[in-house]
């Protein structure tokens, strides 16, 4: 049930922010109630406190910015160790891949 409460309050905060209305616990609770969702009473207060401390628009705009932390580190390591060693490893992987099987007759013909 808590994930429903979090989701409903998140949507309510985004609606209030989009409309330029001040985000309060009462307004969040009113929107959630109008949507017909029953949540625990502490969710609106938690989301209202979060909205006081954070700029909601910045949070929405930076949703995809935090997910790429691991990839640049992994990509930087081979570059520092020498690019010549990385190229043969990629060629070996291509050789090890099994050939794709054909879609030959497997006995499941629809119109047989």
From Swiss-Prot:
Modified residues (Phosphoserine): 102
Taxonomy, superkingdom: Eukaryota
Gene3D superfamilies: 1.10.10.1410
Any one GO molecular function term: structural constituent of ribosome
Region Disordered, annotated ranges: 85-112
Pfam families: Ribosomal_60s
GO BP annotations, alphabetical order: translational elongation
Any one Gene Ontology cellular component term annotated for this protein: cytosol
Keywords: Phosphoprotein, Ribonucleoprotein, Ribosomal protein
Signal peptide: none
Annotated function: Plays an important role in the elongation step of protein synthesis.
Family note: Belongs to the eukaryotic ribosomal protein P1/P2 family.
Quaternary structure annotation from Swiss-Prot or TrEMBL: P1 and P2 exist as dimers at the large ribosomal subunit.
Alphabetical list of HAMAP family matching this protein: Ribosomal_L12_arch (MF_01478)
Protein name: Large ribosomal subunit protein P1w
